[in-house]
Amino acid sequence: CPSRGLGDVYKRQSLPLTTDTMSLATNDNVDILIELIGGSKGIAYKVVKKALQNKKHVITANKALLAVHGNELSKIAEQNNVCLNYEAAIAGGIPIVKAVRENLRLNKINKIYGILNGTCNYILTKMANNAEDFKNVLNDAQKKGFAELDPTFDIQGIDAAHKITLLSSIAFDIPVNLKATFIEGITKIDKYDFVFAKELGYSIKLLSVASKKLSKIEQRVHPCFVKLKSDIAKVSNEINAVVVNDSVIGKNIFEGPGAGAGPTGASVMSDLMDIIRGTYNYPLGVSMKKKKKLKIQKIDDLSFPYYLRITAKDKAGVMAKISKALSKRKISIESIIQKPSKRSNFAEIILITHTVKESSLLSSIKQIKRLPEVSSSVKFIRIEDSLWP
């Protein structure tokens, strides 16, 4: 029941409460265990595992638990012919698990992408609209309850990585593999990146992407430049948005609140009704016996256009040296702007590259950093032009 209900005298008298969490996993009067504790270790893991072993259905909103132990727990659920449902674990009020696991199952999904963390989207929206620094916006988000007191999992991209890793497993019939997911958060983005992005016709979003091409998988979470006119640039504040590409319908777009008591509670109740109606699905889409171990590509092997921001001395010949370092790796420049830097006698050189392999870009950046005229700060952000209309 909602936490406010536990403080009600009538509720306390009419509902059996216990401080012995593990007893729920073995209690013969319990048919369905709902776990909303959180975390991948400790009591949450122990009680869910024990409940499944004792042939009890489990509903959870714990994406960290499933991203770390999803293969093991799914196998136990399958062996005991019980449900392990987790609609509330991904994108709050958006029924994305049901859509991917059931409704679009036969449509040959080839890509899932979007905004899966409301805290980051709220912060990036405020930075874009108000030209504020990251730390100031984070403090404001914490005061308003949009960010946790310890926001590490959110702002470092870990929460979004948990979610896209699970969706990838369901969509592409592969085991859950969080370690193979590339993760980069939003902490290095500052207000000037938004200023430059806007001038170039872009905004910045934390995107989660999972895709399958032939027998290769991509799983990644990182900030991206997206076109200002695109639909995804307009997804603001704590709202989540997910696109599922398939070979039958094409783009299936889902948008809604990513967290909160109402959306989370609605998803939990949806899972509960499925169990009561006798609806059973393999937790990760198919039997664990049918999961295929496909190669998950490293980010270094992928190719993107890039935004490069280089702080360098404002003197003749510097741009020629930077261009030479890029051309050695056959990296061509689409556009360039130069702005005064906060530092005296320095300039901010902003480049947009054509599509290039990330390993090549990183090699060029190393060479650029060694130039005596360049400060140690060379920033790059990947550009996603093709994902969203």
List the model feature ranges, each with a label.
Residues N136-K234, I239-A241, G260:
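Substrate-binding/catalytic subdomain of NAD(P)-dependent oxidoreductase enzymes
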Residues E78-D159, L166:
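Rossmann-like NAD(P)H-binding beta-loop-alpha module
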Residues T18-T19, I34-E35, V58-A61, L84-A88, ...:
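General beta-strand structural signal in soluble alpha/beta enzymes
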Residues N110-Y113, N121-L124, D140, G145-D150, ...:
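Catalytic, metal-anchored helix/loop core of enzyme active sites in primary metabolism
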Residues S267, L272-P389:
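A conserved regulatory-domain signal marking ACT and ACT-like small-molecule sensing domains
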Residues G42-Q53, K63-G92, V97-R101:
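Rossmann-fold NAD(P)-binding glycine/threonine-rich loop
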Residues C1-L6, Y10:
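Single conserved hydrophobic/aromatic residue that forms the stacking wall/gate
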